[in-house]
Amino acid sequence: MSASKEESLSPDEMRQKLYQTFKSRGLLDTLKTQLRNQLIQELQAPVRRGESASRRSADHTDSVLVSACNSVVVDHLRSAGYEYTLSVFQPECGLSKDKVLSSRDVLQIMKISPHMPLYKSLVSNIQSGQSGFLKSLLMELTDHSVYRDCSDNSTQTTSIAAHKESLVEKMQLIDEEYEVLRHRGDRWASVEAKLAEYRKEIQEQAQIELNAKLQHFMDVEIAKVKQEEKERSRKEILELRRDMEKTYELKSEALISREKNAIERLQKHQEIEEKDIYAQRQAVLREIESVRSREMELRQRMEAFDKSCALHEEKVKTMEDLLRRRELSVKTMEDSFEQKLKSELLKYQLELKEENMKRPEKLTENEERIRAEAARLQKEAAVVDAKTEDYERKSSEVKQLLMELESSRSQASLLKQQKELLREQLENMRDYPELKKHTLELQTRISLLKQQLEEKQQHNQRLTQELSAPSHEHLMLQAELRRLEAEHKLEKEELETQKNVLHTQLQHEVQQCALLKTQLMECEERTKWMNTHTEELKLQLQQTQQGPALRGPKSRTVAPEHDSDMVISALSRIRELEQEAERLEEAYRSHQQRALSAEDPTLHRGSQNYSRATAAQQHRVISRSPIFAGRPIEEEHEEFSRTPSPAERLASPPARRLSSTPQSASRSKRRADEEHDEHSLNPECVKGSSNTDRPALMFPERLISPIPAEELSSSISPNSPVMKSTTRHTQSPAKLQEILLSSSSQESSPQPEKITLHDLTEPIQMVSADQPCLLKDCEPELQQDHPDVQISSSSSSSSSSQREEEQQRETHTLQQQPHEEQTQEQRDDAGGHVTSAASPTGGAEEANPLQRYMQMLMQDKQQEQSPNKESSGSHEENLQSESHEHSAGVISHDEADDDFW
């Protein structure tokens, strides 16, 4: 109702809509023009307007010049688009569309010959549609008046004034002719108007007379037709009355004779029927007693059937209780099994590290197993489908039998109704033959119903026996069906998740391949650059070998050895780069293997599930294992936060970082700003480096970042599981522990671990020697990743227990946070003291972590060279003497070391 009310419009809205539609279609404009035309025609009537109006209309219609002017105005209004004024002007001036003169006719009236240039220009403008006739005429006239004084001296030309005077004279002549014609037309205008009025009056009188004659003729004819019809109907009614009276008399005589015969027959029949009715009453009473006894038997059988159904329901309930108990026992077994798994996983960690090299073989075996299991599952699905079809067929048969039971009940109710009808018929029994026939029909029906009842009772008994005692095979099939359906659903879900994960992994692998290719190209470029740099160093060697004669006897023994050390370090750096390229290829292959092993589907039960879970766990353990545990965290941070300069690559010890590790764009920008500030604040260092005898080779234009900033920002996201497990030391240990816990809680979800692009390019976590407690706290969480994936899909109770365990671990980590923070502060203080003692520059450079890192590297280098120093004391003295001479060069090398990594 509300919708109909909303759809219905008010009368005002309806008027507005009609007005808008008429306006858009142009009906309003046409109506307005018609009304204006009628008003103007009425106002122009000669009787109302008098002689002056008749003169004006005659002048307008008869004068050629006025019609030409009107047609020019009409053409101008039409070309300018003034339709409203045009609709008013046309009826007012008395011009119809047919009487409007064309532009050529107007030019002919103006006596402009077609050979004149004015005629040609006007016609061309009108045909091109640039402007109307009046506008083009005015333009030509203005152009003519503007250029009238122009004349060519080389040719004999006449002025345009004579032509203009001739035009004026022509217009005056036309006006005079127009006046003469107007005076002539005034005589006949009033006569024509009167003749038109007389014609109208005569036509109206003739029309009135014609209508009166037609009306009189129609009245006379209608009266005649009515009288004829009345006479015909009266004659027909009389004939029908006579026929009806004759037939009525004949029928009444026949009915009287029939009534007499019928009364006699009825008396005889009543005597016979009374005897038959008495005998039938006795028989019906006997049948009623037999029907009652059968009803009692049917009721007893129905009660027995209901009792058997109730017993069957109780059995089903007991079976459900048993199944619930079994489920509870299974859950308890699963919990105990989980605990065993947790204990066994701790033992298997060491074995899994050894099995890491055998992963490709295991992967191929797993693929073959998956294929075999897929074929087996397809076969089992076909068997299950066949069993389900059998089950549906049997259930349909049971439904049909139940329908037949209901139909038998409905037939029993129908029998009751028939019995009541029989009672009523016994009470109101009058017609003997009909009753006899009805009784015979009832007897036949009763016999048929008895047979049907007996058959259905036997059938029902057989069905109840079958239903009450279900077969053991049927129960086993139902249980297997449920189990197989659950397994099939799980397998489908796992296959879908595996497909999605493999698809995403494929995309990530493609992107990683592209990144690794670019990084390999960069490594090749670096090797080329190193080759060129070695050549430059050789040239520098030659120069330094030529220079000792100028420096004196002290530097002769030291400079060649120092230069040879630099060449050896450069060659070692080239070898390291080649090894790094090989490591890159190995890392890419191992990552492919890890990605495949991490995404294995958990389709199998028993030992196969454990093997897959441990394989994925092995990946996580290796990615989180404390490789390079002996290195400090500051060194690792500075190593991964900046790109190496060429001079640092020569002077630094062997690098421990893969070139595939990404460099953060924000860190690189920050580092560049810091270097710019340092160079601006310390110009003395730059001067010192430029004044040294041996120039420090620095190539800032050749610094190559491993990954561009755009690709890095797209590839690195903080939400990946590997990113969470391999965070830098810039965060506090408590934050690191929280991130590890969050990653373990995310990995314990039933969804498999997804590998993103930055996971492939992420460096391995460098864990210091004093952080084993963090890894020990995180290990049980990492061990539970894949078992939780398998168990969470089977039961929801295990997930709740896992959440409780995770909460306990979080509380444990929160308790350990203060202790870890204290140890971290102490370690930072110790590192600060070491760097302050070893730094050669002022206090401004001590706060710089890069300077600290370089000093630590120098200390390591000195420790490595300490046995050589003990053996050669004289060599050490020479180095000390040379260090005073080349202090500015050392400072320049230290500045170059800031750009290392």
UniProtKB/Swiss-Prot annotation:
Subcellular location: Cytoplasm, Cytoskeleton, Microtubule organizing center, Centrosome, Centriole; Cytoplasm, Cytoskeleton, Microtubule organizing center, Centrosome, Centriolar satellite; Cytoplasm, Cytoskeleton, Cilium basal body; Nucleus
Coarse class of the protein's main subcellular location: cytoplasm
Region (Disordered): 541-563, 585-697, 709-901
Record field: compositional bias (Polar residues): 605-617, 712-734
InterPro entries: LisH, OFD1
One GO cellular component term: cytoplasm
Domain LisH, residue spans: 65-97
GO terms classed as biological process: cell projection organization; convergent extension; convergent extension involved in gastrulation; determination of heart left/right asymmetry; epithelial cilium movement involved in determination of left/right asymmetry
Modified residues (Phosphoserine): 659
Post-translational changes noted in the entry: Phosphorylated. Phosphorylation at Ser-659, by the cAMP-dependent protein kinase PKA, triggers ubiquitination and proteasomal degradation of OFD1. Also increases its interaction with TBC1D31 and regulates its function in ciliogenesis.
Keyword match Cell membrane: no
Coiled-coil annotated residue ranges, if any: 164-512, 564-600
Effects seen without this gene: Embryos display several alterations during development including perturbed intravesicular fluid flow in Kuppfer's vesicle, convergent extension defects and randomization of laterality of organs.
A Pfam family: LisH_2
Compositionally biased spans, kind Low complexity: 735-754, 792-801
Keyword entries, A-Z: Cell projection, Cilium, Cilium biogenesis/degradation, Coiled coil, Cytoplasm, Cytoskeleton, Nucleus, Phosphoprotein, Ubl conjugation
Top-level taxon of the source organism: Eukaryota
Bias-annotated ranges (Basic and acidic residues): 671-681, 776-788, 802-831, 872-887
Tissue: Widely expressed.
Stated role: Component of the centrioles controlling mother and daughter centrioles length. Involved in the biogenesis of the cilium, a centriole-associated function. The cilium is a cell surface projection found in many vertebrate cells required to transduce signals important for development and tissue homeostasis. Plays an important role in development by regulating Wnt signaling and the specification of the left-right axis.
Family per record: Belongs to the OFD1 family.
Quaternary structure note: Homooligomer. Interacts with TBC1D31; regulates OFD1 activity in cilium assembly.
Name by which UniProt lists this protein: Centriole and centriolar satellite protein ofd1
Gene source species: Danio rerio (Zebrafish)
